[in-house]
Amino acid sequence: MVALRLPRGLWTAALTVMLVVLGAPVAEGRDSPQDFVVQFKGECYFYNGTQRVWSVDRYIYNQEEFLRFDSDMGEYRAVTPLGRPDADYLNGQKEALEQKRAELDTVCKHNYQIEEGTTLQRRVQPTVTISPSKAEALNHHNLLVCAVTDFYPSQVKVQWFRNGQEETAGVVSTPLIRNGDWTYQVLVMLEMNLQRGDVYTCRVEHSSLQSPILVEWRAQSESAQSKMLSGVGGFVLGLIFLGLGLFIRHRSQKGLVR
């Protein structure tokens, strides 16, 4: 299903409703509020392209919807008592009512054709990374985090596998996060007990991909970690001695020049 909010349509009716609403508290003998907000929202919903189209117009006063036009109903319906006079009036305007019903084609389907080549077909491939939540330790509980970032549209499927077998227990996902630039991200975490030789795979399916993304993460043994740390330490120590040697040589050359 695709939903588009399209602020186009029968603005004359919307303006009429707003004017009636603004005068309603006085007509009913109530004091007018100091601050008020009147909103109009036009929404179009699409199923399987334009095979099934449904539209809803919502009229809102101070954050409360009071009147609605539903294309399936074909008429205005009051949501609260405040909307009854407006519904009666607008349903009595036969020509305007027929125009409102026609907006399913003139507005919703029309705008779908405009947006189809840009917004509705826009695809951005996700970036997938795996990282443990804390330092690796064999035979200890840990949390692997599969970060799926910067993708569009929002529908995405993320699965965890351990040695080729899907893991469903201990899988937790964050809600879908909007990045604010028409892309999304989600974190899917797997609680596991780290064992030597285990291979974990995060599998991501998305409409922008011709085939799923598979990212692997392998548990390192303690000896492998020690060797890696020793190698890193040796490399850093070598850089220190190299820098010291270059410094001494530079000082010696300056002394000879003098």
Curated annotation (Swiss-Prot):
Protein localization: Membrane
Glycosylation, residue list: 48
Residue ranges, annotated region (Connecting peptide): 218-227
Beta-1 as annotated region, ranges: 32-123
Domain of life: Eukaryota
Disulfide bonding pattern of the chain: 44-108, 146-202
InterPro entries assigned to the protein according to its UniProt record, in alphabetical order: Ig-like_dom (IPR007110), Ig-like_dom_sf (IPR036179), Ig-like_fold (IPR013783), Ig/MHC_CS (IPR003006), Ig_C1-set (IPR003597), MHC/Immunoglobulin (IPR050160), MHC_I/II-like_Ag-recog (IPR011162), MHC_II_a/b_N (IPR014745)
GO biological process: adaptive immune response; antigen processing and presentation of exogenous peptide antigen via MHC class II; peptide antigen assembly with MHC class II protein complex; positive regulation of immune response; positive regulation of T cell activation
Keyword tags: Adaptive immunity, Disulfide bond, Glycoprotein, Immunity, Membrane, MHC II, Signal, Transmembrane, Transmembrane helix
CDD domains: IgC1_MHC_II_beta_HLA-DQ_I-A (cd21001)
SMART domains, A to Z: IGc1 (SM00407), MHC_II_beta (SM00921)
GO CC annotation, single: MHC class II protein complex
Ranges per topology, Cytoplasmic: 249-258
Keyword Signal in record: yes
Membrane topology label: Single-pass type I membrane protein
Region (Beta-2): 124-217
Keyword Amino-acid biosynthesis among record annotations: no
Signal peptide: 1-31
Ig-like C1-type domain span: 126-230
TM regions (residue ranges): 228-248
Ranges per topology, Extracellular: 32-227
UniProt GO MF annotations: MHC class II protein complex binding; peptide antigen binding
Family: Belongs to the MHC class II family.
Name the UniProt record assigns to this protein: SLA class II histocompatibility antigen, DQ haplotype D beta chain
Species this protein is from: Sus scrofa
